[in-house]
């Protein structure tokens, strides 16, 4: 190619479904995905392409591990950051194309020397999630290593509305409009394409010397292409006719040669995955990447094989078609399967390009055992440990379909994918249960369940509850003064708020929930809870189990405090926190968090009395009775019991205690009985009436003041 042709030719290397981090726990296959991605980047450097185009699923997990992220960043740094000049320009509005904090293509940043730009959309494995709608690719984008595009903001009502803005590139006389569409749930995107004006395509504006028809239009998407169920896939005929070339991700079978779609005028390439993640027939085909050279409105594809991919051999056998197998003899079945496996291993070794780096092959045999007995696949694979990479799942058994149910007679609507079928069943079960909930909408629980199971979001349900509670609080606070509500009126008001929120949700897309949070930490929890004005108190039991932020306490003091908190659970007063972090915890129940009080006077009095008695009981529960059981004259009498003297002497010494951990030292009485006595006396204190609260408070203060020397002695023994 001459220098003039090179200056007008845009060279692009296309790859999809790298699945970095796949099988990272497997000692044999843990490096396969990284070696394949390293080879792809090396090919891009060797072929001197203008940029690398990735079609989604760069990562295998929605939350990749730190090891996976570090290795991915290392590979991109080695191959993308250099002093090579970038030969093309981005002439479109970059703030629209790249929706991040910087809003520009990475090679235009003056602080970075980017020699190989990488453009990528997200797939179904690494799609954005959480309150901030971020994905793992956003991390690479923030590192200025990847240009992340194709992230759609679903707006409008019903199924939603999306607008696709192209990245306009120009190299010499060649102009390219690159459209990106990150993964959207197939059923929803299918409905959107069939809804008028739900999907809008923005075309380049007419400029001097450049008409709209002069642009070469490329689309990169990551969706189902299989025709098994039309509702769970995207048809090529949904796409606009002005497109010239389509890169189709998500399908792992390598169909790298561009195929023309009849009646549409564009070509489709399906590069497939660079690492085998499902051991099926389609994955056994050789893996390739595509070198796409564009000049004007013409393009030239060149497929390049990947040599670092682990060899994979797949075959299917029907036992009844084999004449040398006895249906009643298991040994004959084993001998035949052993022979097939050995042949596949030998076949894989012959395909090895570099003999010095022969890898253990992947072997999969699909066995139709109709009329025969099965064998244990794991026991069968034990003899091939060290010979194949997947000894635990070499065999997969199946039976022939019943008569009259051939594949030709199966309707397309009945060919549901197993994972899609199960997902529909889960949603249907939740919907059919008809839960009569007053705060949480069922749709929000569906989304939380999806993120908890599929995206490993451990705080999905907690975020769902917190978001709906805050939304309910806000609506109640806007209506009227919360303190004027009675309990019955509050329940009715909450029900009305739920109906209003359900109406609002019905006008918004189902996937636009704001409560999901995949990155909640203790700092975020503290910030979020502090924003709720005058409506929170420490809930030791619930918040400690939910977030695990309350620090452990020492001795009986912490346990007695927890007991007093449980004893006051019915009173809408402030509870005592166990540590500094407990002040940031908020109870997730509605009544307490809103701060409704049935009787403010009695509640405040009970709270002060409970606080004083709780501190006394918590510090003196080793061998002193409750404040109600002790008469005033008893405090003036000396302790004549030898048992008390011994316990007092023991407390004065700092020697190893023989009692249990966290209990009072030197006490010979039953700790459980003391604990019950203190909690029962506290309950009696809290149940006192308003008419005699003042007298009780005065008597109680006198008793507490008199018992202070005893408390001080025990407190010093417990603190050590």
UniProtKB/Swiss-Prot annotation:
Acidic residues: bias regions: 618-633, 690-699
The record's free-text note on cofactor binding: Binds 2 manganese ions per subunit.
Protein's UniProt keywords contain Transmembrane: no
Compositional bias ranges of the Basic residues kind: 567-579, 650-664
Keywords of this entry: Chromosome, DNA damage, DNA repair, Endonuclease, Exonuclease, Hydrolase, Manganese, Meiosis, Metal-binding, Nuclease, Nucleus
GO molecular function: 3'-5'-DNA exonuclease activity; DNA endonuclease activity; manganese ion binding
Residues that bind Mn(2+) 2: 57, 124, 250
Active site: 125
CDD domains, sorted: MPP_Mre11_N
Family as reported in the entry's similarity comment: Belongs to the MRE11/RAD32 family.
Protein name: Double-strand break repair protein MRE11
Phylogenetic placement of the source organism: Eukaryota, Viridiplantae, Streptophyta, Embryophyta, Tracheophyta
């Amino acid at each position: 190619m001459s220098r003039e042709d090179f200056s007008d030719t845009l060279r692009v290397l296309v790859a999809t479904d790298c699945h970095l981090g796949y099988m990272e726990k497997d000692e044999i296959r843990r490096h396969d995905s990284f070696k394949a991605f390293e080879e792809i980047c090396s090919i891009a450097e060797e072929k001197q392409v203008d940029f690398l185009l990735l079609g989604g699923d760069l990562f295998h997990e929605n939350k990749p591990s730190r090891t996976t992220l570090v290795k991915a960043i290392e590979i991109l740094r080695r191959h993308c950051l250099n002093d090579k000049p970038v030969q093309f320009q981005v002439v479109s509005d970059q703030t629209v194309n790249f929706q991040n904090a910087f809003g520009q293509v990475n090679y235009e940043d003056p602080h970075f020397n980017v020699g190989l730009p990488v453009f990528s959309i997200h797939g179904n494995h690494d799609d954005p999630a959480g309150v901030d709608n971020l994905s793992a690719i956003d991390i690479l984008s923030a590192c200025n290593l990847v240009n992340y595009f194709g992230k759609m903001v679903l707006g409008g009502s019903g199924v939603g509305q999306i607008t696709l803005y192209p990245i306009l590139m120009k190299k010499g006389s060649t102009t390219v409009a690159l459209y990106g569409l990150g993964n959207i749930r197939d059923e929803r995107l299918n409905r959107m394409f069939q809804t008028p004006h739900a999907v809008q395509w923005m075309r380049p504006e007419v400029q001097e010397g450049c008409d709209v028809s002069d642009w070469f239009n490329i689309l990169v998407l990551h969706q189902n292409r299989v025709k098994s169920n039309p509702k769970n896939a995207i048809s090529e005929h949904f796409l606009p006719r002005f497109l010239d070339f389509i890169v189709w991700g998500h399908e792992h079978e390598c169909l790298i040669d561009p195929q023309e779609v009849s009646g549409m005028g564009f070509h489709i390439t399906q590069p497939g995955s660079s690492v085998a993640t499902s051991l099926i027939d389609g994955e056994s085909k050789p893996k390739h990447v595509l070198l796409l050279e564009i000049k004007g409105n013409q393009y030239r594809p060149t497929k390049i094989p990947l040599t670092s991919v682990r060899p994979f051999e797949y075959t299917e056998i029907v036992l009844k078609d084999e004449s040398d197998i006895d249906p009643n003899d298991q040994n004959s079945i084993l001998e035949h399967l052993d022979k097939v496996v050995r042949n596949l291993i030998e076949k894989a070794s012959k395909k090895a390009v570099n003999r010095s780096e022969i890898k253990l092959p992947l072997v999969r045999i699909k066995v139709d055992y109709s009329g025969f007995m099965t064998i244990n696949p794991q026991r069968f694979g034990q003899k091939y440990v060290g010979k194949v990479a997947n000894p635990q799942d070499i065999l997969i058994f199946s039976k022939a379909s019943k008569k009259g149910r051939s594949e030709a007679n199966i309707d397309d609507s009945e060919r549901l994918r197993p994972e899609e079928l199960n997902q529909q069943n889960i949603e249907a079960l939740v919907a059919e249960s008809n839960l009569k909930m007053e705060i949480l909408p069922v749709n929000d629980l569906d989304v939380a369940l999806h993120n908890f199971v599929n995206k490993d979001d451990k705080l999905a349900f907690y975020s769902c509850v917190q978001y709906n509670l805050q939304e309910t609080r806000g609506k109640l606070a806007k209506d009227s003064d919360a303190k004027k509500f009675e309990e019955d009126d509050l329940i009715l008001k909450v029900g009305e708020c739920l109906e209003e929120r359900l109406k609002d949700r019905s006008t918004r897309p189902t996937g636009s929930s704001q409560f999901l949070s995949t990155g909640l930490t203790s700092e975020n929890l503290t910030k979020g809870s502090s924003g709720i004005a005058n409506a929170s108190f420490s809930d030791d039991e619930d918040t400690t189990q939910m977030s695990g932020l309350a620090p452990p306490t020492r001795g009986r003091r912490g346990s007695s405090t927890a007991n007093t908190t449980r004893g006051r659970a019915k009173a809408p007063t402030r509870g005592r926190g166990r540590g500094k972090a407990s002040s940031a915890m908020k109870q997730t129940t509605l009544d307490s968090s809103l701060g409704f009080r049935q009787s403010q006077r009695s509640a405040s009095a009970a709270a002060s009395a409970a606080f004083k008695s709780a501190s006394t009981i918590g510090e003196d529960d080793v061998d002193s009775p409750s404040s109600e059981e002790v008469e005033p004259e008893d405090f003036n009498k000396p302790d004549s019991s030898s048992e008390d003297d011994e316990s007092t002497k023991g407390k004065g010494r700092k020697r190893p205690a023989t009692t249990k951990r966290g209990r009072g030292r030197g006490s010979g009485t039953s700790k459980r009985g003391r604990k019950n006595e203190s909690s029962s006396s506290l309950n009696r204190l809290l149940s006192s009436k308003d008419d005699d609260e003042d007298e009780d408070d005065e008597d109680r203060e006198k008793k507490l003041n008199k018992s202070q020397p005893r408390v001080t002695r025990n407190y010093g023994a417990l603190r050590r």
